[in-house]
Amino acid sequence: MKTSVRVPVGAGLAALLLAAGAVGCAKEDKASESPEMTPAAAVAKAAKNTEEINSLHYRMTGKVPEEGRVKAEAEMQIKPTLAMSMKMTALDQGAEGTAEIRLVDKAMYIGGGPEAAKEMDGKSWIKFDLAAMGAGDELNQLGGASQADKNPATESTFLTGAKDVEKVGTETVEGVKTTHYKGTVTLADLEKSLADEDKATRDKRQKSLEQYEKMGVDKLTMDMWVDGDDQTKQFRMRGDAKKGPLDMTITFLGINEPVKVTAPPAGEVADLAEMMKESQQG
């Protein structure tokens, strides 16, 4: 088996997609109508509702630096333990642009289908033991995918830091009536705002900010579509990065529904830790 493993192109999108992905929102009792609520207050209320997320089902489409156009659909369980299943395609990358990612039992599995099997003696999945590998060099080879163990709802709070939040209008998203809000926020302002947060929140947001800093993004234009239950139904973020534009839209198809994720069949999996060990011995 080859010990020099090239992760499928789609897998390199994982961090960005997961980080930008689940901005949505825990279900709570519908708030009383409040026509006087300012755009900033409405956005803050929707962002607050992300704190009780248990699970979600969402779709993502857009563009990311280098890879270009992407689409993905995922189911994720946040509580009581993290688990995730995502199918993604980098539309401009041909056969190498399709990948499936599963996160279960503190291990990440990245499947590249037939293309990956050609390079790994017929095995189409690579296993990364996140607990054992930590932040080591091997895990860093995944780039964005190494961030899959963080709560992806963090970015939903970024719009609350915008100084120019405004109401765009009323729009229907996936058959649901929503109010569309828009604003811009700089990473510098977000960095400054961390000083007022508790350590757990500060660490979580800092981890997300670092991903954008690495891409060279210094300002984000953000849109949020909020439904009648003060929940985020759709979310969009745009920015200019060093290697191309970022423009991602996330639409929520379901929240707090059962999520079941299983590991791929053992016979189809190549364990990266074992492969690295064999390489060192060889």
Curated annotation (Swiss-Prot):
Protein name: Putative lipoprotein SCO4651
Keywords (A to Z) from UniProt: Cell membrane, Lipoprotein, Membrane, Palmitate, Signal
Signal peptide segment: 1-24
Presence of keyword Signal: yes
Lipidated residue numbers (S-diacylglycerol cysteine): C25
InterPro entries from the UniProt entry: LolA/LolB/LppX (IPR029046)
Disulfide bonds: none
Primary subcellular site in the record, as a coarse category: membrane
Source organism of this protein record: Streptomyces coelicolor (strain ATCC BAA-471 / A3(2) / M145)
Residue ranges of the TM segments: none
